[in-house]
Amino acid sequence: MICCEIQQKSHKKNKPQPDDKSLLARFFHADRSLTAVASELDSFDGRAEPDRCSRLVSRLRQNQDKVLSITNLIMEELLGEDRDPRAFRAKFPEEVLQENLAGQLWFGAECLAAGSSIMNREVESKEMRPLAQAVTKSLGNVRVLLRDQCLRNNVPNSKTLHLDLNDYTTEQLYESLKIFDRLFAEFELSYVSAMVQVKSRHEYEMQQWIGVLFSETLQRALKIGLLDQDMVDAFDPGLMFSIPRLAIVAGLVVYAKGPLDMDMPGDQLSEMFRPFRTILIKIRDLLRNLNNQELYQLEKLLCTNEDINTKVPVGSSSIEAPTPEHSSTPTTSSNNNNNNKSSSSSSGTGSGSGAGTVERLVDQRNNNNNQQNSNESTTLPPRSPSMLSLSASSTPTASPAPSPTPSHSIASTTSSAASSNSTHPPADWSDGDDEDEDEEEDEEEDELEDTEDDTDEEQLLKDIVAADCASGYLIPNTNLGNLLQPQQVPLTDNFVASEDDDEYGTGDQQQEQPQQQGHRKEDEEEPSTSAALQRLRLASSDDSEPHRDQGETIKSTEEQEQQQQQQEQQTLQSSRQRHSHSHSHSHRHHHRHHHHHHHSTHQQQLQHQPHHHQPHPHRLTRSGRKRCSMEAAVEVEQQEQGLASGDTSAASSLSDDVSLAMRNTTARLKFNTENLLHRLFVCIAGVADQLQTNFASDLRQILRSVFLMNMSSVEEEQIEIPEKTKESELFEFRASENDVIQESAGSNQSIYSAEEVNPELDNVFSAGSRHSAGATMQRNNTIDNPSSSNTSSSSATTRNHVTRSRSLGDQETIARSMPAPVHQQEQEMQQQQDHQQQQHQHQVQVQLQRQRNNSVGSNTPSSASSTSSSSEQNSPVSTRSGSSRRRLQSNNETQMPSSTSTATAAATLAPPAWIPDGKAPRCMSCQTPFTAFRRRHHCRNCGGVFCGVCSNATAPLPKYGLTKAVRVCRDCYVREVQVRSSSTTTSVSVNVGVQMQSQAGRVQTATAS
């Protein structure tokens, strides 16, 4: 009992104080605070007072984190290398590794041990519950042992632990810490793995391969000139976007067997690109159709966002037109180039004049729209085929892309692809569905004519449709301007004219222009979606009613299929020569003008009806325009076979149609290429930019490694400052402190660093000699020796001018001109001063004795005049100016200090050498390191660097020409005070002698008067 009381008293005696900074004391107070918060939480019902409970829980977690951090420091010191490894933290995301991670883990362990479960992680919580209970139990044991050590072996304010290694409790603490460290590390891995997604070994390796892909992509871009090495060395932020985009292209095309191999199973693909696997497959299929020039153009666009500038001649593009309506155009043109020389020449002629024709068509289109807007009351204009195709593709279930194919958004001439994309149209789009079915039949007819080419084009079309639809959920980079806004392409006159090039002739158009009256009004109307789109489609179906009134009826689907078969047979058997001109003529009329008020309109429609077997003008327009270029190319071969029976007008119109078809082919290839590159850019940029958001941490690590690997291998040159053999070479200037003070209006504020002292010109330094004064030199040694005064004055001026020089060469001259070092000069000057003082005292005594004799033994005027004459001869004013000798003695007495100030300039020394700031990281007196707030101060007497506390004294330094108080260190201040006191004593004695001399002079003057 007595032993327990003694032990308790000893524990109270060894209780750590609140201001104790040792580890054990800090743990003791943190643990007490945590215990108090936990006890308060247990003292009331948290559901009754939720606000108080939430505040206490927040304090509890803070205290838990504090206790664990101190415990971690104790384990670092006691366990050292015996601690459990935590290499698994490399798998954690960066946002998980926070300072309060330990507190979160402890709080989670207590919750799991109490029976709680992680939301949506019930299975993992059940598995971790035994481990959490073991962690909390082990931590409680460690806390008890550490509190006991705080009372036993705490050393106040000790930086290390002082435990008794022979004590049983110390050994028990050591083993408990090892167990807790192992359990806590295991729980950390389990808990974090359950809360966030931790990379597996395979995923870690895949991300390393992605880093290799990024590095190879960057090296390839540097090699072909897409990027510059300076951008890599400067860590250009633009590369953060360019490298992932280029890596997608390179991984799909250049390094096809790398980490972006789309042929591997989806579960083996990296998690970064796994969500984009479908769109990446479509992008890969489209990239394989690009030639080298177009691939380079796409990569340049991904790097610089410049405009696409592709020059695609006829037959030179490796990308076939992906639209079904032109499936046979590239093949036909190539066949014509190989088998028919006349077609080749026609193609060249047409392509040469294509630009001018497009401009004329745009102007004519604008004129027609302005002239005939008043005719809309006659009949309601139906929507254009391109608008219908856009509407068909913009179903409520489809993506907001303007069209499923690149050509639809720029030069669309049919809605067959749109009908294939819109698999679930609304029920009230009846007329639109009939038109879509008609165009599907036209597409089947084209497949019968050219099966292989059309099959390839349909496959490419599906790829583009998939890529376009997939780009709907991708968020493009909003910083890339209009290039990333393909969802709303305005149907301007340029776009409309480009799609109507194949429906205008060069000669017939001028003749038929006066007859065209029924123009459409809304050629430039924007496409819309959802309910507005349904109303537009319904309005389009209603606009076709006037055409039904002219004797044309819409046939059923079965009748249309029969007519299509009859049309196919008749097309293969009949002669194209007989109706080629009227066919193209009809297309022009039906596309631009759906009906005519002229009296010949009905005759033209009756003339076309036997050839096409299609009474509906809308279907006639789409199907005719769809096969226009193909028919024109076929007509070339048949025209050569029937030239003998053909007339001149038919031959000329056929030539126009051939040139127009070839010119249209060139334009379509160009627009298709640009639009395909544009869509590829949107898809690739969308995938790469989403990596910046969804996988920001992983992408940062990869890009950091890529930059470090590809930086310029320039060896870092270590700049070594050569040793200065001469003290004067350490400084760039020799500014006098007195000059600086005079320039700053006499301010005695301290200058914080040597760099703040501004050197002036040499003439300023030489002019500043008038401010110099020597405190240790006596000022009245020129009373009886004016010649020595002049000599010393000239030498002082010369020395003062030399010491004010700020160039290094002048300093070397000073060093060579001085016969001895500075301290030797000071000793010699001190000896000279002592000698002059003794000589001056002797002269004062002699003169006093002489004055005493004169006042007693001689009162004659001659003696008085001689005395006055002698006094005037000794005056430096009379010596310099050469004025008359009829001056009063008071004038001589007044001008004596001027000679004294000139003589004292000889004692001015060179200012001390300042130690550079970079050479003094600590105060030279108290050794306190300098910081951003503890600034450096130079002593003006010794040149050392001190802190503000050690250099808070001020004193004048006349020996350096500093007559006003400047900053000095404490040691120099003590020395200067001693020197000043000694010099003051000497000057007092000299002043007494001067006063006695002046009194004697006044007595002599009075006697003479």
UniProtKB/Swiss-Prot annotation:
Q: Which GO terms describe its molecular function?
A: zinc ion binding
Annotated Basic residues bias: 576-601, 609-627
Q: Which residues lie in Acidic residues bias regions?
A: 430-458
The answer to keyword Phosphoprotein applying to this record is yes
Residue numbers of Phosphoserine PTMs: S541, S807
Basic and acidic residues bias locations: 544-558
Query: Could you tell me which PROSITE patterns the record lists for this protein?
Result: ZF_FYVE
Which UniProt keywords are given for this protein, alphabetically ordered? Metal-binding, Phosphoprotein, Zinc, Zinc-finger
Give the residue ranges for region: Disordered.
313-460, 497-629, 777-905
Cellular component, GO, one term: early endosome membrane
Domain of life per record: Eukaryota
Compositional bias ranges of the Low complexity kind: 327-348, 364-398, 406-427, 562-575, 780-798, 822-878
Stored SUPFAM superfamilies: FYVE/PHD zinc finger
- Please give the CDD domains that the UniProt record associates with this protein: FYVE_LST2 (cd15731)
Q: Which residues bind Zn(2+) 1?
A: C923, C926, C947, C950
**Pfam families recorded for this chain?**
FYVE (PF01363)
The answer to whether keyword Ribosomal protein applies is no
Q: What does this protein do?
A: Negative regulator of epidermal growth factor receptor (EGFR) signaling.
The similarity annotation says:
Belongs to the lst-2 family.
* Name of the protein: Lateral signaling target protein 2 homolog
